[in-house]
């Protein structure tokens, strides 16, 4: 009969902590409407409207949120401009001691990495790169079923300019506490 000796330190998978619970109200399935500022999509770009959907799910035993965003952008007279798509992955990075996210979209295409923090009812991410310009993404909870989402940029590292802002409505029940 063979007896296996247990090593003193077996590897173990990471476990989701309270930081992931704190993200739950922000990462739901949403639909939204809003507007893109003139010059928001680059110099000379017109004001536009946007309507979109987000679908988010927990993956890897609750360690990460995996989200897909899709938005139709139109001129203010209703003419179609483009369909924006973005894939978003976020969670608590224990090594850095902060929220981290990465995104890939079809408008650059760009692959970006962000650092995040929760400030009360606000979830704020800023581009991790130290160079300029930088992006800031903010989710603001306006109640159990509503939020505002803002996208801003800075050219100097101090003053932030609004690119776009949306009123969001949850399309699924609130997470249980």
Question: Model regions: which residues?
Answer:
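Hydrophobic small-molecule pocket/channel-lining residues, especially in calycin-type beta-barrels
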Residues: 1-177
